[in-house]
Amino acid sequence: GVKPGSFGNDRYYYRGPGGVFAITKPIDGKEATHANGGTIGFAAKSIADVDAFHAIGIAHGGTLCEGDPGYRDGVAGTIYIAWLRDPAGNKICAMHRPPKEV
């Protein structure tokens, strides 16, 4: 199995070759529900794929969440990411990790 890692006191990550599974408390401090504290994320092959995911999601009833698509710096480096809430309120995202500069 994949050994767990932690980040702070309330974030736990399980990393494997196929992706990451994380358990965290909601960042906004509100109660955890299906739509707060849970995010389903998809790996994208390109920035264009992330933008297409976001545009199609919004066009089909999704709502803007966490701002416009763009670059974000995180503990694992820079990513290009887009979040939205689907019509049921679930938070979903698509993320592309650009190659590291050499």
Predicted regions and their residues:
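A short acidic/small-residue loop/turn micro-motif
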Residues: 73-74, 97-101
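Short amphipathic alpha-helical segments
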Residues: 36-40
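Residue-level detector of family-conserved "landmark" positions at structurally sensitive sites
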Residues: 7, 67-68, 99
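Conserved acetyl-CoA-binding loop of GNAT-fold acetyltransferases
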Residues: 1-4, 61-63
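Histidine- and aromatic-rich ligand-binding microenvironments
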Residues: 13, 101-102
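Vicinal oxygen chelate
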Residues: 41-87
